[in-house]
Design a protein with these regions (language model features):
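Metallo-beta-lactamase
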Residues: 76, 100-101, 108-110, 164-235, 281-293, ...
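Feature captures hydrophobic
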Residues: 412-427, 431-443, 448-608
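Accessory terminal helices/loops
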Residues: 50-64, 173-177, 186-194, 199, ...
Length: 608
């Protein structure tokens, strides 16, 4: 005997759903249709976040209101102290001394830094005696070449800045470049860009030129200096980066705070990717500001702030917001919360939400909570199902199977698009495309969901990420930062950094049967290295091993420029000399190293 059952149930948005369960046999019940019923309930009422309808212009007010913060202008904070805002995503700051100048932060590229220097020269023609980096982010250091053309100023920074720059610019450059291009909207039309949350724009493109002058003087905890009669105290203040510093001008009671505070909820985590940013260190560093009680606060993004009590109140709210996220995240973590549930638990108090300096136009509380979990406990959520989780393709196949096939899930996804549940559409379209990349009918649904989410989003980073991914999917490309390093910039990077980056591109499948040692003699730097290629691993040894199978003599700059494609490999290789082995053997060695091609986020790697 069997049974036909028709069920009516009410979902969200007051829609009534009707499902007819087919013939149920005692020996072989149609489990899939029952699971489909449960699946629809789960996706409709429990596990998805309902998307808002697309915003009209008035709903962009939170992001657009901040445009005035980034107006291109040089502010006179006090006599002899100037902050240049709006020349790029970050500020550059000028201090005028008795017989020279101090520059704090140098913008993100040479064209912008040359322009700000020209305008600084309208204020003073004195020589630049010192440059101070507040931290290692590109928008604060890669314009430095403009400030050292005719002089050799001292360059001050925290002792950890240089190794951080070298690591960031070698190990994860490709993926952080891609995610940065999405986050900052480098591929978007100007009409799609309001601002980037902490500045007017970040405009890296193929014509962008960078240069970085390494520090000449570093310190660990604090350092008192005097430059051209200006007494300054440099203070280590880890926050947005571990190498962050403050610069205190005691005579004028001015504090330059880098990126530890700006007019937005802080980027306690950045979606372009970063190492863990300690929330505790961050709010403790904000307490340094409160203890110093400056009359003027000069951030490296946005306008200067004046008024001792006003600054104290702003910073108190700011540090309280960071500590609140830190403490309440730990409270939930210790209670056993899953990261997804922790995000729902930790919500800023209303009085902090009202602060004009805590609007979520750059950082977000939810991202910060997830980072707090990962930074304190690592990747494992505590759910045993995630010890050996289904891979993304298998999980997508399971979801499609539960839905009764891709046609059913596609139909359901379309229904969600009609009622403007864009986050649901984004999630389900990902399952469908991972299940079968040939389901081209899904792509327009996903693109529309991404675009609607982007239009309605007031967080600049999320907005640009949504819109750029829609563009990538529409035009089938992967966003990348197109900037190539200049020969001058490459010259400043040690050979060991370049080699470390090079060996990370080893294709193990081409080297599992290999055991060879290749020696490098860099004639210009008088350095020697050996790369021991051993069954899928390339070990860099900082010396020339006697039993090397192949030994090549070369110029380090040729090697760097060849690897970054500033020079043609075909012509550059002809300049190398071989003390042992030959060009053919060396070419075969090089072929074993190649970076994996980047894929669109929603795709599943083939692992070929």
């Amino acid at each position: 005997m069997g049974l036909n059952v028709k069920v009516l149930f009410f979902g969200s948005q007051n829609y009534v759903y009707s499902l007819t369960f087919g013939w149920f046999d005692k020996n072989c019940m149609k489990i899939k249709t029952l699971v489909l019923f449960l699946f629809l309930i789960l996706f409709n009422d429990c596990n998805t976040t309902k998307s808002k309808t697309p915003a009209n212009d008035s709903e962009h007010i939170h992001l657009e209101e901040f445009n005035a913060e980034f107006e291109k202008k040089i502010y006179e904070v006090a006599p002899g102290v100037y902050s240049a805002v709006g020349y790029g995503i970050a500020n550059s700051i000028l201090l005028v001394g008795k017989d020279g100048l101090v520059i704090i932060d140098t913008l993100d590229e040479l064209k912008a830094s040359k322009q700000v220097l020209e305008d600084f020269r309208k204020i003073s023609s004195l020589p630049i005696k010192a440059i101070i980096y507040t931290h290692s982010h590109p928008d604060h250091i890669f314009g430095s070449g403009s400030f050292v053309t005719d002089v050799s100023p001292e360059v001050y920074a925290h002792e950890s800045l240089l190794p951080t720059v070298q690591k960031l610019a070698s190990e994860t450059t490709p993926i952080i470049g891609t995610r940065s291009a999405r986050m900052f909207g480098n591929y978007l039309e100007k009409s799609d860009l309001v601002n980037v949350g902490i500045g007017p724009y970040q405009g890296y493109n193929a014509d962008t030129k960078l240069d970085f002058v390494p520090p000449t003087k570093t310190f660990r905890d604090s350092l008192n200096i005097e430059v051209s009669g200006i007494r300054l105290r440099l203070i280590h203040a880890p926050g947005e980066t571990d190498d962050q510093i403050y610069i205190y001008h005691p005579e004028k009671n001015i504090l330059f705070v880098g990126d530890n505070i700006y007019k937005a909820f802080p980027n306690l985590y950045t979606i372009r990717g970063t190492w863990f940013r300690s929330l505790k260190h961050w709010y403790e560093s904000l307490d340094i500001i409160r203890n110093l009680k400056p009359e003027h606060l000069v951030p490296s993004h946005g306008k200067p702030i004046s008024g001792k009590s006003y600054i104290y109140d702003i910073v108190t709210d700011y540090r309280d917001a960071v500590q609140f996220v830190h403490d309440q995240s730990l409270r939930g973590i210790n209670a056993g919360y899953h990261p997804d549930d922790l995000v729902q638990l930790v919500q800023l108090p209303e009085h902090l939400k009202k602060s004009p300096y805590l609007k979520e136009i750059y950082g977000k509380v939810s991202w910060s909570v997830r980072s707090a979990f990962a930074g304190n406990l690592g990747w494992f959520s505590g759910d045993a199902a995630e010890l050996h989780p289904l891979d993304r393709k298998v999980y997508a196949d399971l979801i499609v199977d539960l839905a009764g096939g891709s046609e059913n899930l596609l139909k359901y996804t379309k229904s969600k698009l009609q009622i403007k549940e864009y986050q649901t559409v984004l999630t389900l379209s990902g399952y469908l495309l991972r299940h079968d990349p040939k389901l081209t009918d899904v792509i327009p649904l996903r693109i529309e969901a991404l675009e609607k989410l982007g239009v309605s989003e007031s967080n600049a980073n999320a907005k640009h990420y949504y819109l750029t991914e829609a563009l990538e999917l529409r035009n089938q490309f992967v966003a990348k930062i197109k900037v190539r390093p200049s020969p001058e910039l490459l010259r400043r990077y040690p050979v060991k950094v370049i080699l470390s980056s090079f060996v990370a591109n080893l294709d193990p499948k081409l080297s599992f049967d290999t055991d060879e040692k290749v020696g490098f003699i860099f004639l210009d730097t008088k350095e020697t290295y050996t790369i021991h290629l051993r069954k899928g691993v390339a070990e860099v040894i900082p010396s020339l091993i006697a039993d090397a199978d192949l030994i090549v003599e070369l110029n380090s700059q040729d090697w760097k420029e060849m690897l970054t494609r500033l020079k043609s490999p075909a012509t550059t290789l002809l300049k190398f000399r071989f003390k042992k082995g030959n060009l053919l053997s060396f070419t075969q060695f090089l072929k074993k190293f190649s970076p994996k091609e980047q894929i669109l986020t929603l795709k599943v790697p083939t692992n070929q």
